[in-house]
């Protein structure tokens, strides 16, 4: 098990002060959030402490997202907004990392837009952060270190300074091999690479010892876990379902297990059966469908069709009747006709999703879809998105209203923002619930009866005295 060796005096040496301060601004998905936790963990071992904000930082990092152009522009806007900090504090080290630098042409764009940056690096060499920060201090030019793939020296174990003490991300694999025609992730995150199950289990058990109650297993395609390490699925090789069973049986203290994100192509009935048997695994499945049209799915290169997707949904409904199913949908993909869009609407009606992330197609340079013709106008895409949202929001509202009067176990996370007498938490199905309570409930699982439903959230009341988690 490869681990990092970190000099605890590095931060002091770089900045000339005993406790240099670091601030990281994170954009994008859970993988980016966890990457930022890892960077905080590495920097803590170098002697850094978290800054209150960017204004009092000695090291400022922007962990960027490239999945849509709007995410890139959001990050760039924030980087430009904080430019004055470099002039008020010339010793401040500013770096840009994450997915955007991995995209062809973006490093040059970043350097052109922000010539005052000290450091640019990507997703594959976070473990080189100590060396990169030292170089950023000593070299006159912007340090650029972007790798095309994850090297063999990438450690299996990385330190992480996690946000909170109840819920934790646990990366089980990196990258994606699917190469959907609209998606930049294989470029930014590389090929699928699984972490050994022994390392994952050890991390989960350590989190349990630290008092964490819930873990989320992370990967761009968790259902492909193990293919690169243990062989093809379906031939007796250790796979994602086996990992779920292993963790479920060997993680005393962990009360809830979640996982994201799934790819329908690799999600087998065997995995659904194993999940159904695992007591700690929550009844929540995020199953990105992207479109309900077979012809659009082919153009997207999603590697499944509508019938196969609905078969997977059927397995879940059969084996886990209370399952909450959510999805991602893209409208306005190149060439999408009204008839194809209607197929997406009919799929949404058929599946009855509990929630959906719905987006207009966003062109990503370097992807095959960017070369496709028959593009829809922005007004057309907006109009279709609005129709889709109306259908999905109606379904979500009705499903939540059906939950009124029912009792759910809620893991309480803390006080609702700005409300000293209201707490919030989540059902096993990943639905947000608020109800009257105080800080003493934090970290407990309590039974809550739902009294009011919104489109996306629920309100409730305590049923009985709270039960402290074991």
UniProtKB/Swiss-Prot annotation:
Domain MTTase N-terminal: 20-138
Superkingdom, natural source: Bacteria
UniProt main location, coarse: cytoplasm
Residue numbers binding [4Fe-4S] cluster 1: 29, 65, 99
Protein name: tRNA-2-methylthio-N(6)-dimethylallyladenosine synthase
Keywords: 4Fe-4S, Cytoplasm, Iron, Iron-sulfur, Metal-binding, S-adenosyl-L-methionine, Transferase, tRNA processing
Gene Ontology CC terms: cytosol
Cofactor binding: number and manner: Binds 2 [4Fe-4S] clusters. One cluster is coordinated with 3 cysteines and an exchangeable S-adenosyl-L-methionine.
Gene: miaB
Xref: PANTHER family: CDK5 REGULATORY SUBUNIT-ASSOCIATED PROTEIN 1, MITOCHONDRIAL TRNA METHYLTHIOTRANSFERASE CDK5RAP1
Necessary cofactors: [4Fe-4S] cluster
Domain Radical SAM core: 162-398
Enzyme class at the top of the EC tree: transferase
């Amino acid at each position: 098990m490869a681990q990092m060796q970190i000099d605890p005096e590095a931060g002091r040496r770089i900045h000339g002060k005993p406790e240099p301060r670091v601030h990281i601004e994170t954009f994008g998905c859970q993988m980016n959030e966890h990457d930022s936790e890892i960077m905080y963990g590495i920097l803590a071992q170098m002697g850094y402490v978290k800054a209150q904000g960017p204004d009092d930082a000695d090291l400022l990092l922007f962990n960027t997202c490239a999945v849509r152009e709007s995410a890139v522009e959001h990050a760039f806007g924030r980087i430009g907004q904080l430019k004055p900090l470099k002039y008020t504090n010339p010793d401040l080290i500013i770096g840009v990392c994450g997915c955007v630098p991995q995209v062809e042409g973006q490093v040059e764009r970043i350097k052109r837009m922000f010539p005052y940056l000290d450091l640019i690096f990507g997703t594959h060499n976070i473990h080189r952060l100590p060396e990169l920060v030292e170089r950023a201090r000593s070299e006159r030019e912007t340090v650029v270190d972007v790798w095309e793939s994850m090297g063999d020296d990438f450690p299996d174990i990385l330190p992480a300074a996690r946000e909170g003490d109840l819920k934790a991300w646990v990366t089980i694999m990196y990258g994606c091999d699917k190469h959907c025609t609209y998606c930049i992730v294989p470029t930014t995150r590389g090929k699928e690479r699984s972490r050994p199950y022994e390392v994952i289990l050890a991390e989960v058990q350590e989190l349990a010892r630290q008092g964490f109650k819930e873990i989320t297993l992370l990967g761009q395609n968790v259902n492909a876990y193990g293919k690169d390490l243990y062989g093809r699925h379906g031939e007796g090789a250790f796979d994602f379902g086996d990992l779920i069973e292993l963790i479920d049986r060997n993680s005393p203290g962990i009360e809830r297990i979640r996982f994201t994100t799934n790819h329908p192509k690799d999600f087998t009935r065997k995995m659904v059966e194993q999940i159904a048997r695992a007591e700690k695994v929550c009844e929540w499945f995020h199953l990105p469908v992207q479109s309900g049209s077979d012809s659009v799915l082919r153009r997207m290169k999603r590697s499944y069709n509508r019938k196969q997707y609905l078969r997977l949904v059927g397995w879940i409904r059969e084996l886990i009747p209370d399952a909450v199913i959510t999805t991602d949908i893209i409208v306005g993909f190149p060439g999408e006709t009204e008839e194809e869009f209607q197929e997406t609407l009919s799929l949404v009606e058929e599946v009855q999703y509990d929630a959906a992330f719905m987006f207009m197609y966003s062109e990503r340079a370097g992807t095959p879809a960017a070369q496709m013709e028959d593009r829809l106008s922005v007004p057309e895409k907006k109009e279709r998105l609005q129709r889709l949202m109306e259908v999905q929001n109606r379904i979500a509202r009705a499903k939540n209203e059906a939950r009124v009067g029912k009792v759910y176990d809620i893991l309480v996370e803390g006080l609702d923002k700005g409300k000293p007498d209201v707490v919030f938490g989540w059902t096993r199905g990943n639905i947000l619930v608020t109800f009257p309570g105080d800080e003493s409930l934090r970290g407990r699982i309590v039974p809550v009866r739902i009294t009011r439903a919104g489109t996306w959230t629920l309100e409730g009341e305590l049923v009985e005295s709270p039960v402290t988690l074991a």
